[in-house]
Structure formats: C-alpha cells, structure tokens
C-alpha cells in the first residue's frame, strides 16, 4: 500500500511521515513564546481510517523494562477510559499492530517522539512511539514517563500540540499535567469525527485544523 509522509517539528513540512517531538525546555529560555493573548486550542493533525472501523486500536510495547511497560499500559488505559467509542488493546502474536511503542536512551533533548504513517488516501495507517529513558543525562521519573506516554498517545489519536503551557499536549515539558482534560477529548473526537461522533462506516478526513477549548 502506498504511503504518504509528512514531517512535523513545530512546523509542518511536506514529506513522508509526521514526526512529533516532545522536548525538555525551561520556560526562562528566550524564544519560548507564551500564548496568553490567543484562544486556548489544540492542533488537529490527522484522522484514522478503516483501521478504526471496529473502534479498536492495537498496540505493542518493546524494549521496555517491566515497570516502564506498566506505565505505558496505564497511559493507554487512561485514554481508553476517557473515550467512549474507542478502545486500546495489547496485540497478541497473531494480530496486526497499529501502534508500536519502544524505549531507548539517547540522553538528548527529545523525551518522546511519534512517527505517523499514512495510507494513499491520507488516513493514519500506523504509528511508532519512541520514549526516552534518559534525557539531559538524567533518568526520567515514573511520573514523567507516564506523562510523556499520554502525550504521545494524543499524537497517535490525531492531535498536534496545544498553544498553552498547562496542557497534556503542550510541546514542551514545562509544567507536567498528567490529566486528560475535556479539551483533549473533544479534539480527538473532532479528529476522528466519522467514527467517534457520527459512528459511520465510511472514513472521512477531518476538515478542522485545530480545536478551540471551551
């Protein structure tokens, strides 16, 4: 199946996949813009296609320590509990994997990364999530790992970044918010409206580029 790709690192470029990076950055560093003057909103990136027809997305977790694996499973479960028409399921050996999560240590500034693959119609086909065990030469706490996993799963569900600091979908790890709030949920619903709102069997790409929080 032919795949389309795009790259996203704060700015969206035309290419092969969309890559979202979650970075560590102190709020005092110059160049980090505050968004107080704008409406609070979350970018909408993309839409799942036929894969979501049954309302189930499968995942696998590889190269993870037992404790880290449980944190990622808890992150999937937390999203699962907040989305009525969608369920995450850990794939067995015979199932197609929609979302692959892997761990590594590069001691860089990227704490998490999501790579989204598209089919020829522009729908999400599969995702790969990379989670760092160390960043800035420091081991990440369990709280941070779970937060980053929840953030990356937000990208998996079609979200981009939020334009305000106290959001799970903020592009920077500044003020850790482990909570999935109503704005996150509504944005995911809009990204995948054909299934999660309309309950249709015919996938339709979202026309919304962002969701303004109410």
Predicted feature residues:
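N-terminal secretory signal peptides that target proteins for export/translocation
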Residues: 1-3
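Disordered inhibitory propeptide/activation segment of secreted metzincin zinc metalloprotease zymogens
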Residues: 5-68, 76, 113-121, 196-201, ...
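Metalloprotease/metallohydrolase-associated module, dominated by Zn2+-dependent proteases
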Residues: 18-27, 119-121, 125-144, 160-214
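Loop/turn elements at helix/coil->beta-strand transitions in domains of secreted/extracellular proteins
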Residues: 55-56, 84-86, 96-97, 165, ...
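Intrinsic-disorder/low-complexity, polar/charged segments
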Residues: 65, 91-93, 185
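Metzincin-family zinc-dependent endopeptidase catalytic domain
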Residues: 69-156, 160
């Amino acid at each position: 199946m032919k795949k389309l790709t795009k790259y996203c690192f704060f700015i969206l470029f035309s290419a092969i996949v969309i890559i979202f990076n979650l970075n560590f950055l102190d709020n005092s560093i110059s160049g980090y813009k505050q968004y107080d003057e704008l409406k609070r909103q979350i970018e909408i990136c993309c839409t799942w296609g036929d894969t979501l027809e049954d309302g189930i997305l499968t995942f696998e977790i590889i190269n993870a320590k037992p404790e880290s694996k449980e944190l990622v499973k808890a992150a999937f479960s937390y999203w699962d509990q907040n989305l009525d028409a969608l369920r995450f399921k850990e794939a067995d050996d015979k199932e197609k994997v929609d979302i692959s999560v892997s761990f590594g240590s590069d001691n860089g500034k990227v704490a998490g990364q999501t790579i989204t693959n598209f089919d020829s119609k522009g729908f999400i086909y599969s995702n790969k999530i990379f989670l760092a065990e160390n960043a800035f030469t420091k081991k990440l706490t369990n709280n941070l790992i779970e937060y980053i996993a929840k953030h990356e799963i937000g990208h998996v569900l079609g979200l981009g970044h939020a334009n305000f600091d106290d959001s799970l979908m903020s592009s920077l790890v500044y003020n850790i918010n482990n909570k999935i709030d109503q704005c996150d949920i509504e944005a995911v619903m809009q990204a995948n409206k054909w299934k999660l709102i309309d309950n249709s069997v015919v996938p339709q790409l979202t026309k919304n580029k962002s969701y303004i929080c109410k």
